[in-house]
């Protein structure tokens, strides 16, 4: 049970970080493409 909780926390943290990076990168690429 503990392993499942740790895995869920790890996946959740990585997901949040990946989501934040993915959401922050597109605008910069779009601005560069428009320019």
Swiss-Prot record:
Localization in the cell: Plastid, Chloroplast thylakoid membrane
Any one GO BP annotation for this protein: photosynthesis
Pfam families: PsbT
Keyword Chloroplast: yes
Keyword Signal: no
Main location: plastid
TM helices/strands, residue ranges: 3-23
GO terms under cellular component: chloroplast thylakoid membrane; photosystem II reaction center
InterPro entries linked to this entry: PSII_PsbT, PSII_PsbT_sf
Membrane topology: Single-pass membrane protein
Keyword field: Chloroplast, Membrane, Photosynthesis, Photosystem II, Plastid, Thylakoid, Transmembrane, Transmembrane helix
Domain of life according to the entry: Eukaryota
Main function: Found at the monomer-monomer interface of the photosystem II (PS II) dimer, plays a role in assembly and dimerization of PSII. PSII is a light-driven water plastoquinone oxidoreductase, using light energy to abstract electrons from H(2)O, generating a proton gradient subsequently used for ATP formation.
Assembly mode: PSII is composed of 1 copy each of membrane proteins PsbA, PsbB, PsbC, PsbD, PsbE, PsbF, PsbH, PsbI, PsbJ, PsbK, PsbL, PsbM, PsbT, PsbY, PsbZ, Psb30/Ycf12, at least 3 peripheral proteins of the oxygen-evolving complex and a large number of cofactors. It forms dimeric complexes.
Family from the record: Belongs to the PsbT family.
Protein name as it appears in the record: Photosystem II reaction center protein T
Organism: Zygnema circumcarinatum
Organism phylogeny: Eukaryota, Viridiplantae, Streptophyta, Zygnematophyceae, Zygnematophycidae
Gene name tied to this protein: psbT
């Amino acid at each position: 049970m503990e392993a499942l909780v740790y895995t869920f926390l790890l996946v959740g943290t990585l997901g949040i970080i990946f989501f934040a990076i993915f959401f922050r990168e597109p605008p910069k690429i779009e601005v560069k493409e428009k320019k």
